[in-house]
Amino acid sequence: MAISIKGVNTGVIRKSNNFIALALKIKEPRNKESLFFMSVMELRDLLIALESRLHQKHKLDAAAHLQYEQARDKVIKKMAENIPEILVDELKNADINRRVNTLELTDNQGENLTFVLTLHDGSKCELVVNELQIEMLARAIIHAINNAEMRELALRITSLLDFLPLYDVDCQDNGNLEYDTYSQPEWKHNLFDHYLAVLYRFKDESGKEQFSGAVVKTREATPGKEIEAITRRMLDFSPRLKKLAGVPCQVYVRTV
């Protein structure tokens, strides 16, 4: 049976300065409570889906957006009145079988987003998030991470929500290409519309001209501030391209 949300609470499990998991506790309409533990990867996947729907709402015309905000605020108020308590013991003695191993967005068509969570013990749970609940849920997740003094982690996660890395590449002196592939599930591909090829032109330590590049999938096709920001953030994501951080580059972007 699908889990619907009446209220949510979050907390971070950490060991020294290392993030272990985020505890997500959900109060359902009949006041039943469900507790899940999510790693960074699963949190990122959840937030990618949530942010994609928020992006759609931000593109509404003024009247429709106002109507959405009014309805959202009523839902947020109700959720704030139904925050479930997370007990310290639930964090100290976290049940590993409640750890989310994978998360998949299976329905993104109507007012609800439906996720299938595969847990550590192999069982599956269906989680339904209404679009009016998205901001409250996302806010609770980021607040918990920031509250655990892990702001850098929050920034790292949120910097990867508006594009999908697919390839990064170095052009070798002999003309060959050395590249890495980032496999992405179909449901993530469906959140983005445009393939962009990015070429970084720079000089190495000896002053010789070099080229590196990437292929990403984005929501925007036209180069602008959003795409420019993505080309910078790709340097932080990619181990291959990290060497370009702080290096003067000419960047070329083309729709594939």
Predicted regions and their residues:
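Intrinsic, low-complexity N-terminal interaction/targeting segments
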Residues: M1-I20, I76-F115, V169-S206
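Extended intrinsically disordered, low-complexity coil regions enriched in Ser, Thr, Gly, Ala
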Residues: R14-L66, E111-R156, D204-G246
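Negatively charged, low-complexity tracts enriched in Asp/Glu with abundant Ser/Thr
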Residues: L60-I86, R151-Y179
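A eukaryote-biased signal for long
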Residues: L166-V256
